């Protein structure tokens, strides 16, 4: 299939759209390296350079049919073998779509005699889990009818959200943060893992982006190892069909051993069937029929033998710790220190575990973490090869690519950013927001005059009269008059966020912001800070790095929010009446300058010596947003 050139190179040296190379070694350590592997950057995987950021860093690469952004410093840890011959196309199954049968498959994977239905009236709790940007929050809204924010920036679901499934009494679904794996390195992953392990939901609803199944199934496999009843919701199937693709759902069900339901959360298609299957597997506690993802003869059976040996070794410990033994075994095999601590193995057992894992590494020719990741992606490749017909490139993707050439182009990205933000602030402070503010001020003024006249006519006590007119109407009214500006600014920022432009700005600005110790994703809270500092600080919770969150929170107040406008206006009118516009601009840029100065100061003092390693890699849907770490 491949011709590999003996010479090797670093991924960061590839030219745009270079011939598909193969990863040879993956460097890094700890969380960084584990995230490399979880995202599919494993020895033997194919990669294509897609683009460089306007400032040359980070870069976007394509792997496993999806895009990733990598900083050059991290990309330099990955060594590749260059491959100059074309890659042979993989055979795909027949594209003829097979309709998914309706509900009525209850007990398909288990003997009815072995089923033990839960008592009537018992609460059926569900964990809604999936990758970021796969439509999880949209599905949660369809299931519960709640009005939760649906955004397009990775990490929009930070807190836990609960709701009862509409039309189903005694049910509770929890919307968990979007994650890519069950590795315990980010706050989102820890929240999701602890919820499933500690709160014991009766079932899991795993939502998968049908346009990018290969990426999403990595999390699915780890959820199946938890041995909790689950269903798989194939979301965005309407997009797959419209672009000539299909999924052989019944075959996928047989391969995975769990119900697979095609849906479109945005169009409310297939939701009733999904609910019926979810309630059924939870009520009858039908656990996944498959948790072993490697055959005894795969790569000599090294991983298969190691996992089963570890399961036999830790079976009693896993039962006492209330951790599914298969999940614990795979996590121990890849070096999960938290699981090792929870199992409380004695020294002899730890030595035996290390011997088993070292033997696996020797036989497989890969280190422990890479061997487990490779096992999972090999299984995913088999499933997709047998059941998935990839859709053609959609018109939306083509259009998005053309727009990206301008918005993230080397010479056009920064001018576009300046122009777009200038347009947003001009429309906010001089056109729409200012007009609405004037209307509101007139209405408040008319209402103040009306109440003032009425209280004067009624002979109200002067103290009470002054409290109402001067305190409430003039005081609170002056604050309310800025509400249209705040609402207008957030309206435009939400459009930029939902369109994916904010994520592209993070891709463009990452190198610049890293010079002051921040990441490209910090640009979003800071831009929101121009509207109001409070939501800007709250938006910093989406940042995966604790250091980045702290610095962003401390620097966001330096942005000139709308609450500072009346103060600026008062002083400029009093001291610089002829140059008020210029002084206002200088005050805005002065705040930015002070933020940069304080960031550089904090790097050498408050945050000196703190871990500055790169945070989680995020994938991005080709037609949606970039996800910069």
Task: Report residues per predicted region.
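Short, small-residue-biased leader/transition segments that mark boundaries at the very start
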Residues: 6-20, 617-628
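Alpha-helical membrane segments and immediately flanking helix-loop junctions
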Residues: 517-565, 572
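Transmembrane helix-loop junctions at the membrane interface of multipass transporters and ion channels
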Residues: 558, 562-585, 603-604
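Membrane-embedded alpha-helical segments and adjacent helix-loop junctions characteristic
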Residues: 428-525, 616, 620-625
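Interfacial loop/helix-cap signal at membrane boundaries in integral membrane proteins
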Residues: 355-389, 394-404, 438-480
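Canonical P-loop GTPase G-domain recognition
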Residues: 240-292
């Amino acid at each position: 299939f491949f011709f590999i050139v003996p010479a090797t190179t670093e991924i960061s040296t590839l030219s745009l759209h270079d011939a598909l190379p193969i990863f040879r070694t993956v460097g890094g350590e700890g969380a960084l390296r584990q995230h490399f592997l979880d995202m599919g950057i494993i020895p033997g995987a194919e990669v294509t350079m897609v683009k460089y950021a306007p400032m040359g860093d980070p870069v976007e690469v394509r792997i496993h049919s999806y895009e990733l952004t990598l900083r050059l410093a991290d990309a330099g840890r990955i060594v590749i073998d260059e491959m100059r011959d074309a890659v042979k196309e993989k055979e795909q199954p027949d594209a003829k779509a097979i309709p998914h049968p309706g509900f009525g498959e209850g007990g398909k994977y288990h003997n009815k005699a072995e089923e033990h239905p839960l008592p009537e009236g018992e609460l059926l709790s569900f964990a809604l889990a999936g990758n970021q940007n796969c439509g999880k929050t949209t599905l949660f809204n369809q299931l519960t009818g709640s009005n939760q924010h649906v955004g397009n920036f990775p990490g929009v679901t930070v807190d836990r959200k609960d709701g009862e499934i509409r039309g189903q009494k005694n049910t509770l679904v929890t919307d968990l943060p979007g994650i890519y794996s069950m590795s315990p390195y980010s706050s989102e992953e820890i929240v999701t893992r602890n919820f499933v392990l500690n709160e014991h939901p009766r079932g899991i609803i795993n939502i998968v982006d049908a346009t990018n199944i290969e990426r999403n199934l990595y999390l699915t496999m780890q959820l199946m190892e938890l041995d909790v009843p689950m269903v798989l919701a194939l979301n965005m199937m309407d997009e797959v069909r419209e672009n000539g693709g299909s999924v052989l759902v019944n075959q996928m069900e047989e391969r995975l051993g769990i119900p697979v339901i095609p849906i479109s959360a945005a169009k409310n298609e297939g939701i009733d069937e999904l609910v019926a299957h979810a309630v059924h597997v939870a009520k009858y506690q039908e656990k996944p029929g498959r948790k072993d993802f490697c055959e005894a003869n795969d790569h000599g059976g090294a991983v298969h033998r190691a996992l089963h040996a570890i399961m036999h070794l830790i079976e009693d410990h896993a039962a006492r710790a209330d951790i599914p033994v298969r999940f614990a075994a795979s996590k121990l095999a890849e070096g999960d220190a938290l699981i090792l601590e929870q199992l409380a193995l004695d020294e002899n057992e730890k030595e035996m575990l290390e011997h088993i894992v070292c033997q696996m590494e020797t036989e497989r020719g890969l280190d422990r973490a890479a061997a487990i990741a490779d096992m999972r992606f090999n299984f995913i490749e088999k499933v997709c090869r047998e059941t998935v017909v990839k859709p053609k490139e959609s018109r939306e993707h083509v259009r998005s690519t053309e727009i990206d050439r301008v918005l993230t182009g080397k010479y056009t990205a920064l001018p576009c950013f300046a122009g777009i933000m200038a347009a947003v602030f001009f429309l906010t402070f001089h056109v729409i927001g200012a007009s609405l503010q004037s209307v509101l001020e007139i209405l408040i003024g008319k209402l103040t005059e009306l109440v003032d006249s009425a209280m004067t006519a009624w002979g109200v006590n002067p103290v009470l009269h002054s409290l109402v007119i001067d305190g409430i109407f003039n005081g609170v009214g002056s604050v309310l008059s800025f509400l249209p500006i705040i609402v207008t600014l957030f309206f435009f920022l939400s459009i930029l966020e939902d369109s994916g432009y904010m994520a592209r700005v993070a891709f463009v600005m990452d190198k610049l912001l890293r010079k002051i110790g921040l990441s490209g994703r910090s640009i979003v809270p800071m831009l929101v800070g121009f509207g109001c500092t409070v939501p800007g600080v709250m938006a910093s919770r989406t940042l995966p790095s604790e250091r980045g969150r702290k610095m962003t929170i401390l620097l966001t107040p330096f942005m000139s929010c709308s609450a500072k406008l009346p103060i600026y206006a008062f002083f400029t009118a009093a001291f610089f009446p002829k140059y008020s516009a210029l002084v206002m601009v200088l005050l805005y840029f002065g705040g930015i300058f002070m933020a940069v100065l304080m960031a550089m100061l904090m790097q050498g003092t408050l945050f000196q010596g703190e871990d500055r390693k790169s945070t989680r890699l995020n994938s991005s849907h080709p037609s949606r947003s970039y996800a910069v770490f």
